[in-house]
């Protein structure tokens, strides 16, 4: 088998419609667009959500909520992810270096998900009650 002999399986690819190539093709003249009207024109058609002039659903429903800007720079970290990181002291920079969190993250909270079997020191991270208990049970400590 060579790259130049590869071809798709028989019947897996349909030939593209060749529009405007004579009456006999079935797609000549109007090219499957019918006669006149907005959808037959070049660039014709209505935008997404358009309901023929009726007040569209996205305008009938009220606005609600907002996107918290703090949520964009905050991350949740699982205890199982902490267990995989080398080193005894773990802070925000160590998490970024290990690609556990993105470079734009400014705050992180460690949650109880998974388990940890070695003593680690968390520095400058928020910690949930369950995660705090698990870290201290493993002999680790949390520094503010």
Curated annotation (Swiss-Prot):
The keyword Ribosomal protein applies. Residues 21-31 have a biased composition (Gly residues). SUPFAM superfamilies: Ribosomal proteins L15p and L18e. InterPro entries: Ribosomal_uL15 (IPR030878), Ribosomal_uL15/eL18 (IPR021131), Ribosomal_uL15/eL18_sf (IPR036227), Ribosomal_uL15_bac-type (IPR005749), Ribosomal_uL15_CS (IPR001196). Belongs to the universal ribosomal protein uL15 family. Part of the 50S ribosomal subunit. This is Large ribosomal subunit protein uL15. It comes from Edwardsiella ictaluri (strain 93-146). The gene is rplO.
